[in-house]
Amino acid sequence: MSAALLRRGLELLGAPEAPGAAPGHTKPSQAPMKRTRKAKATQAQKLRNSAKGKVPKSALAEFRKKERRGYLGVNLRFMTSARSTVDESVTRQIMRQNRGRKACDRPVTKTKKKKKAEGTVFTEEDFQKFQREYFGS
């Protein structure tokens, strides 16, 4: 069990710390420095194993250099050089068949609402009768 785990367990249980350890004064871990030292040593070993006077190229760096290269021109040349050998009438027929199939190609048909004839349910006689009853004339 590591010292850090043991310390955490003791903190959780609330047991008193060891008498020699001062609170908050822990020695910084040597792991990051050790890791960088080890990485430098392995890199130096790799350089030593190469041919005399030659520096080995990083495969990742080479890939990144080539990755930046644009393939637009190459692709355009390829597309323009490979001409279609299909007859134009066949392509027109295919285009005509495909044109109406998708929903986005179909025009939206708007249904116009029929206007109802604005008329009244009451007749002229009913209005006159109402007027006489309401206004008293």
From Swiss-Prot:
Localization: Nucleus, Nucleolus
Keywords, comma-separated and alphabetical: Citrullination, Nucleus, Phosphoprotein
Region: Disordered, residue numbers: 14-58, 96-120
Residues where Citrulline is found: R7
The organism's place on the tree of life at top rank: Eukaryota
Composition bias, Low complexity: 14-24
InterPro entries associated with the record: AROS
Post-translational changes noted in the entry: Citrullinated by PADI4.
Cellular compartments per GO CC: cytosol; nucleolus; nucleoplasm; small-subunit processome
In-chain residues carrying the UniProt-annotated modification Phosphoserine: S84
An individual GO BP term: ribosomal small subunit biogenesis
GO molecular function: enzyme binding
Assembly and binders: Part of the small subunit (SSU) processome, composed of more than 70 proteins and the RNA chaperone small nucleolar RNA (snoRNA) U3. Interacts with RPS19; the interaction is direct and mediates the integration of RPS19 in state post-A1. Interacts with SIRT1.
The family this protein is said to belong to: Belongs to the AROS family.
Protein name per Swiss-Prot or TrEMBL: Active regulator of SIRT1
